[in-house]
Amino acid sequence: MLRIGLFLLTNLAVLVVAGVVLSLLGVGNYRTADGLDLTNLLIFCAVFGFVGSFISLFLSKWMAKKTMGVQLIEQPRNADEKWLVDTVVELSQKAGIKTPEIGVFAAQESNAFATGWNRNDALVAVSLGLLQRFERDEVKAVLAHEIGHVANGDMITLSLIQGVVNTFVMFFARIIGDLVDRVIFKNEEGRGIAFFITTIVAELVLGILASMIVAAFSRYREYRADAAGATLADRGAMIRALQRLQAEMSAGVESPLPSSMRAFGISGGVRNLFASHPPLEARIQALRDSAHG
């Protein structure tokens, strides 16, 4: 899905900018003559860590529309758009959620995403490439997968996890900054320039490493969304859709999107730690195994 990349990038940007501004303003009374007041520091980091995460959440739908150039379907202009709207309405009713906004975006890559700050204020969009090359039952399965994300409340859960991660990134970055300032630069009178620079660098590094935790949750939720696609639509169609995506990627179909924003990426080695999606073959096998479970 596209939303994981957008969410992480927005969140990291908000976190770093907030950290810089707060440090320059001297906000946060957590440094005393005896060192850091860890309790006050943790409270301070939790407040601003969750603020950054939820700002990213509330901006996610707007950013997705602007970044991907999504054209909303308010009144279907042809039979394909009418089928798309009718299908999303049907799947939403099955999932027990309000019908999300529906849109398409001009990309030849087979892709789709869902985003939004809650189950009843979401957006589902598909690429023109997917609509043109996939069979309708396969498109329906992909849409069911995305509706599954919305129904499962994945974006809210992701925001809560990201809020916890942000809290500890800010917390440990400031501890590292304080240690460098006091121990290496021997600054005992307030925060020196070493504290500010070290804290910003530590936030960037720790933020990137912490993204592995968020990516691990994202991989887990992909399996759940695949299961939702199989339940709301059809298991066989869900498997065929993944196989078609796998074939396209194996054939080297060019993607205009960065890897973090692709709907169904394949990665290996260390890249798996940062991948927001499991390998396609693992997802296909999980669907097959669940059919016999």
UniProtKB/Swiss-Prot annotation:
Its EC number is 3.4.24.-. It is an enzyme of class 3 (hydrolase). Its cofactor is Zn(2+). Binds 1 zinc ion per subunit. Its main location: membrane. CDD domains: M48B_HtpX_like. GO terms for biological process: proteolysis. This is Protease HtpX. PANTHER family: PROTEASE HTPX (PTHR43221:SF1). Pfam families: Peptidase_M48. Keywords: Cell inner membrane, Cell membrane, Hydrolase, Membrane, Metal-binding, Metalloprotease, Protease, Stress response, Transmembrane, Transmembrane helix, Zinc. One of its GO terms (molecular function) is metalloendopeptidase activity. Zn(2+) binds at residues 145, 149, 222. The gene is htpX. The active site is at 146. GO terms for cellular component: plasma membrane.
